[in-house]
Amino acid sequence: MSNIIKQLEQEQMKQDVPSFRPGDTVEVKVWVVEGSKKRLQAFEGVVIAIRNRGLHSAFTVRKISNGEGVERVFQTHSPVVDSISVKRRGAVRKAKLYYLRERTGKAARIKERLN
């Protein structure tokens, strides 16, 4: 029984997901439906958390919009997510960057990873 579930989940997983880590700046393009129109909307920010659970994997992206912090959780293999592109690699030493919520301005900067 579980082999059938694993096979179905494997078929539904996206193959074109780039590798990224917490601290990386990513741009996620998401399909948004407004009335009868369907368009792509970009959301660019820093990955502060990743949850790896196969088909149910998710990641949290944080950005500052008009001086207000905005966080959004995306399901990695969701059909709503069109594409994910890594803009900048960040060097951090923790898996969850929740401490960035309290920091603003230059204190919230992340060093760039060189490799």
Curated annotation (Swiss-Prot):
It comes from Escherichia coli (strain K12). It holds the Pfam family Ribosomal_L19. Keywords: Ribonucleoprotein, Ribosomal protein, RNA-binding, rRNA-binding. Belongs to the bacterial ribosomal protein bL19 family. SUPFAM superfamilies: Translation proteins SH3-like domain. The keyword Phosphoprotein does not apply. GO terms for cellular component: cytoplasm; cytosol; cytosolic large ribosomal subunit. One of its GO terms (molecular function) is structural constituent of ribosome. NCBIfam families: rplS_bact. InterPro entries: Ribosomal_bL19, Ribosomal_bL19_CS, Ribosomal_bL19_sf, Translation_prot_SH3-like_sf. This is Large ribosomal subunit protein bL19. This protein is located at the 30S-50S ribosomal subunit interface and may play a role in the structure and function of the aminoacyl-tRNA binding site. One of its GO terms (biological process) is ribosomal large subunit assembly. Induction: Part of the rpsP-rimM-trmD-rplS operon. Part of the 50S ribosomal subunit. Contacts L14. Forms two bridges to the 30S subunit in the 70S ribosome, contacting the 16S rRNA. In pre-50S ribosomal subunits interacts with RsfS, which may inhibit association with the 30S subunit. The keyword Nucleus does not apply.
